[in-house]
From Swiss-Prot:
InterPro entries: Ribosome_recyc_fac, Ribosome_recyc_fac_dom, RRF_sf. Pfam families: RRF. This is Ribosome-recycling factor. It comes from the Bacteria. One of its GO terms (biological process) is cytoplasmic translational termination. Responsible for the release of ribosomes from messenger RNA at the termination of protein biosynthesis. May increase the efficiency of translation by recycling ribosomes from one round of translation to another. Residues 137-166 are annotated as: Disordered. GO terms for cellular component: cytosol. PANTHER family: MITOCHONDRIAL RIBOSOME RECYCLING FACTOR PSEUDO 1, RIBOSOME RECYCLING FACTOR. Disulfide bonds: none annotated. CDD domains: RRF (cd00520). HAMAP family: RRF (MF_00040). One of its GO terms (molecular function) is ribosomal large subunit binding.
């Protein structure tokens, strides 16, 4: 009487939620957040590294980011990487630091960010549905092999479906929250 590992399914669904949270955290809203610079990578010491491995990122003011670069020789590379990151940011070099003013988001940019958030949520939902499918396939196989009975298979299948529904509604809730945050002027 085994069936499938419901804890493994829950863990994988939680992983999809965490990946989604990480994706939407990097979307720029009206407020400054150090996460905005998460997608920025720098050519440093012979490889591409995330910005947070060569500098401290701070939020000194609501519409300003500060980047304190540890290695003076990296200032130009960091400046270039931020400018080329398609985030629409223009850093101001101040010695070994960069100040990055965050411009107001116009309506068009807000709508495109909401669209990107929807794409991230769809990607997360697809991942969750794959986990559900794997679980259901495991149940069918276990039932076919005689490892579990039809009743237990149905019971576990209902649990997997409930987990799926709960996880997808959590994604929808997080998306609605982020959408509201982006559209707020």
């Amino acid at each position: 009487m085994s069936g499938i590992d419901l804890n493994d399914i829950k863990r994988r669904m939680d992983g999809a939620i965490n990946a989604f949270k990480s994706d939407i955290a990097s979307l720029r809203t009206g407020r400054a957040s150090a996460n905005i610079l998460d997608p920025v990578t720098i050519d440093a010491y012979g490889s591409r590294v995330p910005l947070n491995q060569v500098a401290n990122i701070t939020v000194p003011e609501p519409r300003m980011l500060g980047v304190n670069i540890w290695d003076k020789s990296m200032v130009n590379a960091v400046d270039r990487a931020i400018r080329e990151s398609n985030l629409g940011l223009n850093p101001i070099v101040d010695g070994q630091n960069l100040r990055i003013p965050l411009p107001e988001l116009n309506e068009e940019r807000r709508k495109s960010l909401v669209k990107v958030a929807h794409e991230y949520s769809e990607k997360a939902k697809v991942a969750i549905r794959h986990v559900r499918r794997d679980g259901m396939d495991g149940l069918k196989k276990a039932e076919k092999d005689g490892d579990i009975g039809q009743d237990e298979s149905r019971g576990q299948s209902e649990k997997v479906q409930k987990m799926t529904d709960d996880t997808i509604s959590e994604i929808d809730r997080l998306l609605a929250e982020k959408e509201k945050e982006i559209m707020q002027v």
